[in-house]
């Protein structure tokens, strides 16, 4: 199991989404976007969990977010709502399809998605945010 392997596997899984057709999958929270739709993911939090006499397990939350640039056209804004929903379902499906991320974690859980409008550099984006919790048993070894 490796943390870098888990992130690499997430990248591979998210890159296979074809509907909606993302122009990029980014492993970082973006500061600006040159084109959309874009799918980004980043490490959000880490919590120590269960502990034994010899090791500690953890849960790391990866935030996955889809970005769709809003336009003045009502028709385009309406189509973005469907694309948001499709993105939420596809991210959920891809990540649940490989719960141990090709052997790089013990288990994982896809959380509840939320939708919001985000201002980034004066441009408005409609976003879908999906938390993804990765559990790694025995991540830290305790030396007596």
Question: Across the structure, where does each feature detected by a protein language model lie?
Answer:
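A short glycine-rich, His/Asp/Glu-containing loop-to-beta-strand
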Residues: 36-41
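Charged, amphipathic alpha-helical segments and their flanking helix caps
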Residues: 1-33, 45-144
